């Protein structure tokens, strides 16, 4: 092993110490929060298997799923959420007020299942345009793809999966703020 000695050794140790204790450049403005360290997976659709990614991710949930969706019409995703709840996973779904009636019956059935709560944003001119969910405070799914059959089958979309407790926590903070709006409408019996 190479061991610096004498003046060179002192200089090396001083430089190493300075490197270790000197803070890196500080981000300012919108980049002020610390960067999130994450395992990142990017998917682009339409393509083979793109529409089934959400179902596979939801199938891996063990404790919690918090989903904020502008659109939730994909019966595969709705069924995956129902199966997760049947396994004991607590499921919360937050939808935009513009959500159409194409899946109203399926969403009502989901909302009445044990371990599931569904809320809809009160009507306003502002959209809740998220297409994201967190699973077990460890994984965040986000991107341009709505939770719809067409998003996975026909539309050009991206889907980003971050395996990061920090990313999931940042989303969960936003989700809790949206979920707590006093004028939200509850769907189902809860």
Region annotations inferred by a language model:
Residues 11-20:
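Bacterial N-terminal signal peptides
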